[in-house]
């Protein structure tokens, strides 16, 4: 199966002004599948982080939100080094960890060489926009349910 949005993800990857990406969409439209498939096709490695497993991840985002610290901690969690340009970092269910959303600002400003994509439900992300959302520091794409062309 091929989702048409993968072409926009590829443009995002190749952009010289890339910011962390937030992939929005309703539940169960395929956000996670699309990001993992994109990572498999266009990156050497994918560091997949599911924030529904909060207990194991809260300590990473509890204090210092510097990209260097987060990358070091995620590399330990992932079990191998996270390399700029070759590793796609996927933050799934990002609405469950508001400080992970906040950290995107620092990745945009201090470490734009890292490819970070976030997936989350529209409602969950919208609930956090007023307090910690990194306005202007992220790119957005919206995934809709399968089109007829994609279905065929």
Q: What residues fall within each predicted segment?
A:
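Phosphate-binding site recognition
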Residues: 1-152
């Amino acid at each position: 199966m091929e989702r048409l949005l993968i072409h926009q993800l590829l443009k995002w990857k190749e952009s010289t002004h890339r910011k962390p990406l937030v992939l929005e969409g309703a539940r169960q439209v395929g956000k996670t599948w699309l990001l993992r498939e994109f990572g498999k096709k266009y990156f050497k490695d994918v560091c997949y982080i599911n924030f529904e497993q909060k207990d194991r991840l809260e300590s990473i985002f509890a204090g210092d939100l510097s990209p260097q610290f987060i990358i070091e901690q995620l590399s330990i969690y992932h079990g191998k080094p996270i390399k700029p340009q070759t590793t796609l970092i996927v933050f799934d269910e990002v609405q469950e960890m508001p400080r992970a959303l906040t950290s995107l600002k620092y990745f945009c400003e201090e470490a734009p060489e890292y490819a970070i994509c976030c997936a989350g439900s529209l409602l969950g992300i919208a609930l956090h926009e007023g307090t910690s959302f990194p306005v202007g520091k992220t790119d957005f794409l919206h995934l809709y349910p399968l089109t007829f062309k994609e279905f065929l």
